[in-house]
A protein has these predicted regions:
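Transmembrane helix-loop-helix hairpins at lipid-water interfaces of multipass membrane proteins
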Residues: 2-5, 54-112, 189-194, 294, ...
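Juxtamembrane helix-loop junctions of ABC transporter transmembrane domains
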Residues: 9, 14, 28-36, 59-60, ...
Length: 641
């Protein structure tokens, strides 16, 4: 992940192969891609904090490239001394010691360059990942409902690493190779301009087929990324609790094995193909270097016999030639390298340029303190489209739904007084969940207003609004962490006594005490080590720890055993006591106790009142009661008897 292409001039054939391979593997289709204006300026601005260390990096690379041309001259001088009529032992020993010292310095420089490049490379990754993650956290919930999680993770991982690699590889490669090629050519022309020109004529024999192999290799590499992504996606879906449970319940392990081995086989096959093309590339470079070396020794040997050149000069020319072809080939791909860096950074900047829809207003202020009054004032609402949440420009982020957004709430007006419980009832798709999401300002309304204690929530500071409104969703989400950490998510500074009080209020303290690790018990992925009732009660405990003035609750529809149901009901009673509450009701006990019931149908409030009054009216609520609640009433009577 850090500047692996440095020091090609001094790296020998092995080092050249790796760097040139990376350059040839770049996809030259990037030359035709559109890059947003100003991307290059922003790219260098991202690297601005590392100007000092980058300066040291360039100095070290330059020094290494200069040192890289010394040893061939030393070895040539040693050969000349040995081939002379009066060889000098002292001279040979001295030159050998100098060559050894140069090798030690070169090794030390390479270690220093690696450290510097790693510091810059990993620093860039850290900075970009942190900024992208922080920015994605600010995006509205509509952004997450319309995009695939894997695509977002790819932006955070692959694109960020790709941008860093393209930038650091390109910088190190261009600087190192340019210096190496310049110095090597100067020395070679000084030693023998005729042999140097002949050697350069051979270069196209390698470059032309190498470019074709490189293009094919870039296509194969891109295909391998896609196939690997498919295989990884299969593992991701099957290795989580839900996926594994589904496979077992439907008895499909053999089919899953066959499907996975098929994908893994494709990964294997394309890996072999990729390795062979890479080998062809390296073989072509090695063959060209060998042919050129043969020419140097042949032509130079003849000139040495004729007395036009010394034997050591021929040896030095052959050594320089090996160091020349790799950097020249890499420099021929500079345009692709630069465009790859720009395209990679542009994809990262696309995410950073997404404007969050839900932000603090310029005049944002805290929610007025005290018991909370909720007011929905002629609210109309439709969910935002993909374009409105700024996904249209992200071509690689799969948009799950591109259809036009139809209105879902019409002229919704109601008031909840301090301490009151209002139940939302209605058929599926009536708008109950939408109302529950508008109050904590997960979305903004198109017209009308929502007020808490007289303040329009669009003018409330988000931190204050979040502290005022507590939400318990139908499927309570728990992180793969300890019970303690999941609870402290609501209030990081809570004491053990406060945690115990919250657990007791949620009717789950006894269960936690029976666990071997108590509060430090890890709940598993999404809390799968806990039962449905236990997850609900932990979510309620988390709410109690937060202690909001307003509670928004979406009751779970899952059927619980009578003991768990009773515990959940007691926990809910504790959570709602003394708080202004808005509840999507699925339990008969909730609608019976509600101060007001709002009956929704197709986004409108069609009935409102108390349980007994609405039943007597014989409208939609009475019909829903017969469908949804009457069975619960019968069960309650049966249990009582």
């Amino acid at each position: 992940m850090s500047m692996p292409g440095h020091g090609m001039g001094a790296g020998g054939p092995g080092g050249q192969f790796g760097s040139v391979m990376r350059s040839m593997r770049r996809d030259d289709s990037v030359k035709g891609q559109h890059v947003t204006r100003g991307t290059a300026r922003r790219m260098f601005r991202f690297a601005r904090p590392y100007r000092g260390i980058l300066t040291w990096f360039l100095v070290l690379v330059t020094v290494e490239a200069v040192i890289g041309i010394i040893n061939p001259l030393l070895f040539g001088s040693i050969v000349n001394s040995l081939a002379s009529s009066h060889p000098s032992k002292q001279l040979v020993i001295t030159l050998s010691l100098v060559a050894g010292a140069v090798a030690v310095v070169d090794t030390a420089l390479s270690i220093g360059i690696r450290y510097v490049s790693a510091s810059v490379g990993e620093g860039l990754i850290y900075d970009m990942r942190s900024q992208v993650f922080e920015h994605i956290q600010k995006m509205p919930i509509a952004f997450f409902t319309r995009t695939q999680t894997g695509a977002l993770i790819s932006r955070l991982n692959n694109d960020v690493i790709g941008a860093q690699q393209a930038f650091t590889d390109t910088l190190s490669s261009v600087v190192s190779n340019l210096i190496s090629v310049t110095l090597v050519l100067v020395v070679m022309f000084a030693l023998s301009w005729q042999i140097t020109l002949i050697s350069l004529v051979i270069l196209p024999i390698f470059v032309i087929p190498a470019k074709r192999v490189g293009r094919r290799l870039s296509v194969i590499t891109r295909e391998s990324y896609g196939i690997n992504a498919e295989m990884n996606n299969t593992m991701n879906e099957r290795f989580n609790v839900s996926g594994a449970l589904l496979v077992k319940l439907f008895g499909r392990p053999e089919e899953e094995r066959d499907a996975f081995t098929s994908k893994a086989g494709r990964v294997r096959d394309i890996g072999v193909t990729q390795a062979m093309y890479a080998r062809f590339f390296i073989a072509a470079l090695s063959l060209t270097a060998a042919l050129a070396t043969a020419v140097v020794y042949g032509w130079g040997g003849v000139q040495a016999i004729d007395g036009a050149l010394r034997v050591g000069t021929v040896v030095a020319l052959a050594a320089y030639l090996v160091r020349l072809y790799g950097p020249l080939t890499a420099l021929s791909n500079v345009q692709i390298d630069v465009m790859t860096a720009l395209v990679s950074f542009d994809r990262v900047f696309e995410v950073l340029d997404l404007p969050p829809m839900i932000v603090d207003a310029d005049d944002a202020r805290p929610v007025p303190p005290g018991p909370a009054t909720i007011e929905f004032d002629h609210v109309d609402f439709r969910y935002p489209t993909a374009e409105e949440v700024s996904l249209a420009s992200l071509e690689s982020v799969a948009v799950l739904d591109t259809t036009a957004s139809a209105p879902v709430l019409f002229d919704v007006t109601f008031t909840v007084q301090p301490g009151q419980l209002v139940a939302l009832v209605g058929p599926s798709g009536a708008g109950k969940t939408t109302i529950s999401q508008l109050l904590p300002r997960l979305y903004d309304v198109q017209s009308g207003a929502i007020r808490i204690n007289g303040l329009d929530i669009r003018h409330a500071a988000l931190s204050s609004l979040t502290a005022t409104v507590g939400v318990v969703t139908q499927d309570a989400h728990l992180f793969h962490d300890s019970i303690r950490s999941n609870l402290l998510y609501a209030r990081p500074g809570a004491t053990v006594a406060e945690l115990d009080a919250a657990l007791a209020g949620a009717q789950i303290a006894t269960m936690v005490d029976t666990l071997p690790d108590g509060l430090d018990t890890v709940v598993g992925d999404r809390g799968y080590r806990l039962s449905g009732g236990e997850k609900q009660r932990l979510a309620i405990a988390r709410l109690l720890l937060k202690a909001p003035e307003i509670v928004v609750l979406d009751e779970a529809t899952a059927h619980l055993d009578s003991e768990s149901e009773a515990a959940v009901q007691l926990a809910l009673a504790t959570a709602l006591e003394g708080r202004t509450s808005l509840v999507i009701a699925h339990r008969l006990s909730t609608v019976r106790e509600a101060d007001q019931i709002l009956v929704l149908d197709h986004g409108r409030i069609v009935e409102r009142g108390r349980h007994e009054d609405l039943l007597a009216d014989g409208g939609l609520y009475a019909e829903l009661y017969r469908i949804q609640f009457e069975g619960q009433d019968a069960e309650r009577v049966e249990e009582a008897s």
